[in-house]
């Protein structure tokens, strides 16, 4: 990066410091991961210079024959990865992919049913401060207070009560798998579309360690980072393409449009302008990596590690929402420890451990304080951590949280963290 160092030493210094931070610390934020050098190299190329509004073979600009191939590779690999009929790899982020689904399936003011944000849902599933809760009528289902799990009978009752036009599945802090077949039965009963946002679990689904939503849903969205370990971005998928049931037709021929056509139009020109071709190329690289047998092994290790960390925390007296995990994260309810999520997050960060405060079901604290702590295993599993290391991580977390204001303990744990990370190197700081 000599050109950057010479041209803008301040930004070069920022990047170098961030590489150092990632190298030296324990990254336990469940939505974060470490992209490969190949993925990062694809993003830092001349492809960033090219405008390519439209789709391969049907662009609004000339000179797209080369970038067309990059997008075709991304689409082909994504379809192979998820054994699906159609994908759009252009969404800049998961939120943009989600907005295209709303634009396609709903009209402003329509009712949809999603997982309550305070029970593990996501902002784009109906939060009143997000477009999804501003433009549409959001209703919610949640988890049971005793079990921390979704009760499908309660979901059915709620769906019959509110009669949604769409039901959404997916979460940012739900540690269990979803019963897609049961969700589809409920959606069919009330005549609703079923949409799965697999942003958090896309890699685990691709690796075969979680249930597959494709056979049961009308549409699926995802990010391409998180457990999928590609670049930051979004994607929309259809298990099978089908004629849109809303009866929308092509202007000239009068034929019924396919759902894929409506979703393509909802991405561009509906919610975005030009696609980011350097990121789409990086998505193609990430998908190729995820098609390797080693990626399936990685995803199984992610789950094994989360379960090992959760078991050790439970042994040390921590309450886990749903009493464990099926996926990449554990959610700790800290109320029995007399701690807030904010206090825990700050104490751990001082010890070189990055996690995030999080609402827990039936939380009585604000989103800026919270009663919970969310911990994830994808990033450190990428660095080669196994169950033994994650049991050690749980022990260090407990040591810090026993007295979150003890600076000596924080300093000692930070040294221990650095030594552990040195055994599992990530990036060479010289890359910056």
Swiss-Prot record:
Belongs to the SHMT family. It catalyses: (6R)-5,10-methylene-5,6,7,8-tetrahydrofolate + glycine + H2O = (6S)-5,6,7,8-tetrahydrofolate + L-serine. It is an enzyme of class 2 (transferase). The lineage of its organism: Bacteria, Pseudomonadati, Rhodothermota, Rhodothermia, Rhodothermales. GO terms for biological process: glycine biosynthetic process from serine; tetrahydrofolate interconversion. Pfam families: SHMT. NCBIfam families: PRK00011.1 (NF000586). This is Serine hydroxymethyltransferase. The keyword Nucleus does not apply. PROSITE patterns: SHMT. Homodimer. The record marks 225 as: Plays an important role in substrate specificity. GO terms for molecular function: glycine hydroxymethyltransferase activity; pyridoxal phosphate binding. It comes from the Bacteria.
């Amino acid at each position: 990066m000599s050109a950057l160092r010479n041209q803008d030493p301040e930004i070069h210094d920022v990047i170098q410091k961030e590489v150092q931070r990632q190298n030296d610390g324990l990254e336990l934020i469940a939505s974060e991961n470490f992209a490969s050098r190949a993925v990062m190299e694809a993003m830092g190329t001349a492809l960033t210079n090219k405008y390519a509004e439209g789709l391969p073979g049907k662009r609004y600009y000339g000179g797209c024959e080369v970038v067309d191939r990059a997008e075709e590779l991304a689409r082909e690999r994504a379809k192979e990865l998820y054994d699906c009929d159609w994908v759009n790899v252009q969404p800049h982020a998961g939120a943009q992919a989600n907005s295209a689904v709303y634009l396609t399936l709903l009209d402003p003011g329509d009712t949809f049913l999603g997982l309550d944000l305070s029970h593990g849902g996501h902002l784009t599933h109906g939060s009143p401060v997000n477009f999804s809760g501003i433009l549409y009528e959001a209703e919610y289902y949640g988890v049971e207070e005793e079990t921390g799990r979704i009760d499908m009978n309660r979901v059915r009752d709620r769906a019959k009560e509110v009669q949604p036009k769409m039901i959404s599945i997916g979460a940012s802090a739900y540690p269990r798998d979803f019963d897609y077949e049961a969700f589809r039965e409920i959606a069919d009963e009330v005549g609703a579309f079923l949409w799965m946002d697999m942003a958090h679990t896309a890699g685990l689904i691709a690796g075969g360690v979680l249930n597959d939503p494709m056979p049961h849903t009308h549409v699926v969205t995802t990010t391409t980072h998180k457990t999928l370990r590609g670049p930051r971005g979004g994607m929309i998928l259809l298990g099978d393409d089908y004629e849109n049931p809303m009866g929308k037709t092509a202007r000239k021929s009068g034929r019924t449009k396919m759902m894929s056509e409506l979703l393509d139009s909802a991405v561009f020109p509906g919610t975005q302008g030009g696609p980011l071709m350097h990121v789409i190329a990086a998505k193609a690289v990430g998908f190729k990596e995820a098609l390797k047998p080693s990626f399936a092994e990685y995803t199984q290790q992610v789950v094994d590690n989360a379960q090992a960390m959760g078991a050790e925390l439970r042994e040390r007296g921590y309450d886990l929402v749903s009493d464990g995990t099926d996926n990449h994260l554990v959610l700790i309810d800290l109320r029995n420890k007399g701690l807030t999520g904010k206090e825990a997050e700050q104490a751990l960060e001082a010890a070189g451990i990055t996690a995030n405060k999080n609402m827990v079901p039936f939380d009585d604290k604000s989103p800026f304080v919270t009663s919970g702590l969310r911990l994830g295993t994808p990033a450190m599993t990428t660095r080669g951590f196994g169950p033994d290391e994650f049991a050690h991580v749980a022990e260090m977390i407990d040591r810090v949280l026993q007295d979150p204001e003890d600076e000596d303990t924080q300093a000692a744990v930070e040294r221990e963290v650095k030594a552990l990370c040195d055994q599992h190197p990530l990036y060479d700081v010289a890359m910056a």
